Amino acid sequence: MKKVLDKLFVILPFEKPFYDKHSMEVEYPGNPLLDEISHYSATQNKEEFLKEHNLGAKPIIALLPGSRTQEIKKMLPLQLSLVEKFPEFDFVVAGVSTHSPEFYSQYMEDSNAKLIYNNTYSILNSSHAAIVTSGTATLETALFNVPEVVCYKANPLSFILGKYLVKIRFISLVNLILDSPVVVELLQDLCNRDDLEKEFRKITFDENNRVEMRYMFGKLRNILGNAGASANIAKYIVEDLRK
């Protein structure tokens, strides 16, 4: 990379020190998710969303089972196991347009959870807590200040090889950026109904836990910086071209 790149722009703050160590010209201009969420916040109305989907009578729990077929097959049934146990909440599944209603219905036909397509930000903006499959969604959830539990279950061999090849303490972006176990990660064998229910109770009923997690989400925002990643990149490029 060093041989073919004049400058590298990264979207996660912990990436810069890594490339700095290899004497690469690298800049962290900010994370584009901050731009997306800032734009969303300026244009959306929470009350309209709740009214449109007949929500708001109960606290909402966001279920984000992922976007890939295999992860949804693994994660959605587990996440839906909470629905019957906690009737005091409205559970909302964040659906993605790459999967049909029929695909989701095979897991949801006996569930009182609601499926809403292509509205993840509106769901998070209205939620009391969230159960999230590991990925970018873990960071998005934190940026909406929603307490969360992260779930992930990979192929056992792939997981073992991954741990051997990549020496990292965490898999969620929230914990990686903060370098601290702020959100619970239920991985592999720990990704089961009993452990999920235990951690779910903490993020919904334990106010001290919720306050502490949100405090750390504030620190996360400070580390990420302000919105404007694309504008910052353009600024860097123009400055370099003028040299």
Where are the regions that the model predicts?
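Nucleotide-activated sugar donor-binding and catalytic core shared by glycosyltransferases
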Residues: M1-K243
